[in-house]
Amino acid sequence: MNGVNDIRETFLGFFEKNGHARRPSAPLVPQNDPTLLFVNAGMVPFKNIFTGAEKPFAPRATTSQKCVRAGGKHNDLDNVGYTARHHTFFEMLGNFSFGDYFKDDAVALAWELVTKEYGLDAKRLLVTVYAEDEEAPAIWKKVAGLDDSRIIRIATSDNFWSMGDTGPCGPCSEIFFDHGDKVAGGPPGSPDEDGDRFIEIWNLVFMQFEQHEGGKRTNLPKPSIDTGMGLERVAAVLQGVHNNYDIDLFRALIAAEEEVYGQKASGDKTASFRVIADHLRTSAFLVADGILPSNEGRGYVLRRIMRRAMRHGHMLGAREPQMHRLVPALVAEMGKAYPELGRAQVAIEAAIEQEEARFQRTLGNGLSLLDKAASELSPGEALPGDVAFRLSDTFGFPLDLTQDILRGRGIEVDVDGFETALDAQRETSRAGGFSSGDQATEEIWFSVRDEKGPTKFTGYSSTAGEGRLIAIAAGGALIETVTAGPAELVFDATPFYAESGGQAGDHGEIVFEDGARFVVRDVQKRAGDLHVHIGELVSGSVKTGMKAQMSVNAARRKAVMANHSATHLMHAALRKVLGPHVTQKGSLVEADRFRFDFSHGAPVTAAQLEAIEDEVNAQIRANIETGIKVTTPDKAIEAGALALFGEKYGDEVRVLSMGDAGEGGRPYSVELCGGIHVSRSGDIAVFTILSEGGVSAGIRRIEGATGAEALAYLKGRAQIAADVAESLKVPLKDLPRRVASLTEERRTLERELSEAKRKLAMGGGGGAPAGPEVINGVNLIARVAEGVGGKELRALVDEAKSKIGSGVVVFVGVDGGKAGVAIGVTKDLTEKFSAVELVKAAAAAIGGQGGGGRPDMAQAGGPDGDKANEALEAVRAALKG
């Protein structure tokens, strides 16, 4: 039972057995909470239930919640790898009561789990309580038989939890495990409490008060329970180790690292292995939840975490991407508990590999700059902020990475100077760029949502409807009245679809009761379920409370619906033609076309694209009715419906079934989707693929079209083919054969031309002597080759070297006004003459810089093709000494 997976399952199973609804972990991106970068505690997904904004789905629940603490208020990044219990990613086991049971049952359940299910020695357990909480000590004495010496009263806020300045709050009680007097450290509340002897394993929060402005507290009508047990911490206790990185999960990851990096996790390398293991988990789970590395927001936090791990990989000797090779080991350890890891494995590996390849290109140069700048500092002097900024801006070093590198050298960074340089860049960008400040912020929309409630969407079966205006925003702020110009409007109900799931928002028109007209150019979801209509008031004036008739552009929606439905059929076709590893990684569905990103490790061949087109069009011709079913996410996925990785689903989901049922009676495509679709597959009319290409490592993109746009594209292609056939004076059916014949003729002519150029160059054409000249006793073949470059130039040098026996060969190829130089030195002369040094002299003559290669073969280029002979003279001068 001591393995991490068993410990997790024991916790969840125990509470499930005791009437708790087992819920899967919520995604790491918080829903309906703009104040958090990431979910950082088990209660975060239930915040709206605790505040009363949402009704509980069950009276009690249990979860193992994915959490990330990196960036913002809760940031453990700097400590990870150097302490026993800091992580950027961790799992929080929790049980929750939403007004059901309270302190007595919470304590009884906790004590039963730790002493009976986990088998911890009760004599080695002690608890803390809030000093003003008189109930908790009595309950601990009654339930666990603890005496006063093992119930420690804490008067500080460490044992009082609050959600903020106002809202639900209450005292805490923490359970500690005593490792014994052989380990340094004192009990909680003592001067030595930071030692490793007494380890907190569980925090029970008794949510019993409402905090009001001014500090007043009143009793909640329905007190609740929120508990949090760090899985990694309790696993360390149960496995008898003092460091979280010594539990079985991390041992397996570090063993995989040792194999990948070819080093042992010992001595001063230990911290690097631990950093990589921790950051691998964070990186993988964030990518699985739909976040990719970028330069802003959550994507930037992910980039910082990835690059910190990759720098430690560089310290272990990695000079090419390696971290992605650890993903299979992580999936093996955690994929059963978190199936999204397996579903997203290809995307995770691709994202990590691509980021490391990008970082490797600048890491060496950045480290060189940092080393040089650090070596020039006086003792106690901080690294200048402008240097740290250059490392960030030019070499991709996040500030905390620079700080982490310098920490071991005892050097600090001038953070104020860094911020000054960053602000200067922002001002420059702002002066020359576009600000999006005209749109209302997410916080504003949350206030509207809290006060007015969600928008009721009526557009699944209609393109028209009536709504009452409940909010207006313009210039980035809420207003009561708008008279003209751009604005954002929210109604209590709307037939307008808001962009989500890749499907573009509706366009259309809204006419108010007094005749005012608003043109809708986009609809976006804000605060979870508000439909914000973005557009322009073209006549009249409107104010909140007014009613309006709302009309969606039906023709445009029909085109969007056809494209959206086509992506579902194409997704199924991709999995059939390419394999079941294909999963959707993103999409954008517009009226005129769509794009669809998916996991696949190689370009899709022409034959495969044709097969995919044929599959989809066969389903369109079958004209099967589209099926819609509303169910729970778990039941839908159990029934085989595909879910988009990283997507947040509510308690109920729409399951879309499309296409002809095959063997077993299962429809061709079954997916979770809240979008709007055609009623029959035949409504799509026709489907065609416009393009296929790579987006990033392991991710491909197909763009396509349906209906009138597809027909127009196909007609255009047919017309091009007809025009080409006419110009070549062949029947259309013979065009492929004629083009193939012309292509082969061109190849033959190119080969003949290349051979003629080679013979001309080797024979000393253009006035050069046919044989070698001799300079200081060294044979030299020096030629200008017109129209020759690249590999052909190198081949000429190799051929001439084989004939000259001993000597130096230089060819300057001139093509398109530019020059290329290739120089070869026979092996008997490489100690006296280096091709690399000779090519530098030649390159300077034609306006080039440097060059590269080996002592026996080197190449360079330059922009001045008319100075080819000067390049030859430069080599002659070098041989003369």
UniProtKB/Swiss-Prot annotation:
Residues the entry annotates as binding Zn(2+): 564, 568, 673, 677
Lineage: Bacteria, Pseudomonadati, Pseudomonadota, Alphaproteobacteria, Hyphomonadales
Gene Ontology molecular function: any one: zinc ion binding
Protein's name according to its UniProt entry: Alanine--tRNA ligase
Keyword Protein biosynthesis: yes
Origin superkingdom: Bacteria
Organism encoding this protein: Hyphomonas neptunium (strain ATCC 15444)
Family to which the UniProt record says this protein belongs: Belongs to the class-II aminoacyl-tRNA synthetase family.
Function: Catalyzes the attachment of alanine to tRNA(Ala) in a two-step reaction: alanine is first activated by ATP to form Ala-AMP and then transferred to the acceptor end of tRNA(Ala). Also edits incorrectly charged Ser-tRNA(Ala) and Gly-tRNA(Ala) via its editing domain.
Localization of this protein: Cytoplasm
